[in-house]
Amino acid sequence: GTIGAIATARAAADGYTIMFTAHAPFAVAPFMQAGTTYDPSADFTPITKVAMIPMVLVTGAGSSFKTFAEMAAQAKAEPGKLDYASSGVGTPSHLNVEVIKLEQGLDIIPVPYKSTSQAMTDLIGGQVPLYMPSFPAALPQMKAGKIRGLAIGSAQRSKIMPDIPTVAEVLGKPGMTAVVWYGFLAPKGLPADVVARLDVEISKAAASPRIVAAIDKIG
């Protein structure tokens, strides 16, 4: 992420260097990683955003709470007793839960894991009661009945799992989302005509039936 962003920021703005990236090198790394040498708002030319992947707050199938409201009530009744898994400090699974904590006034404790798979294993096993991975990462285990969705970060409910309320619904915050965006950027100063051409071609590819079907399949 950050290595690619540094290389892109230093490259010539000739249309031959473009970066496909998630949000982290631009929305997180400059504020949490020492040695980040680029300015996310000044050193790049945005081309187009191609996808937004929602996060989903989940609990194990055997959890003592079945809904977001029940979880929040338990957390408020027992401050500091509940914890939640994250895929590491500064990851979406960490920062989005911290936002929920602030909005709800919850005192729940982050437990950073080295990987999504490790966090998911402990969630299923009951060692940790909460986790907020990406929806595609959680979907197979939700379909298998091993975990339960409490709130999804998309603007609307998922067509695949329509019973899971949105984060906006459970928090009473219309328009609020918890997503990871993916898009293409180029070095600062890329000519407008090149940006327009790349935007057209990338958007055309992203709208192809095969790509749309693949994205719909994972939520």
Please identify what each model-predicted range represents:
Residues 1-2, 18-28, 49-50, 131-139:
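Ligand-binding clamshell of periplasmic/extracellular solute-binding protein-like
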Residues 24, 88, 136-137, 153-156, ...:
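Glycine-rich beta-alpha junction loops
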Residues 2-13, 75, 98-103, 117-127, ...:
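Short helices/loops that flank or line small-molecule/ion binding pockets
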Residues 45, 71, 146-158:
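Conserved helix-loop-beta element of the AMP-binding
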Residues 30, 159-161:
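Cytochrome P450 core scaffold surrounding the K-helix E-X-X-R motif
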Residues 15-21, 83, 129-133, 149-151:
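Paired acidic/hydrophobic, glycine-rich loop segments that form the ligand-binding mouth/hinge
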Residues 154, 212-219:
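Mature extracytoplasmic/periplasmic domains
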Residues 10-17, 23, 31-118, 167-175, ...:
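Hinge/capping helix and adjacent helix->loop/strand transition within the periplasmic-binding protein
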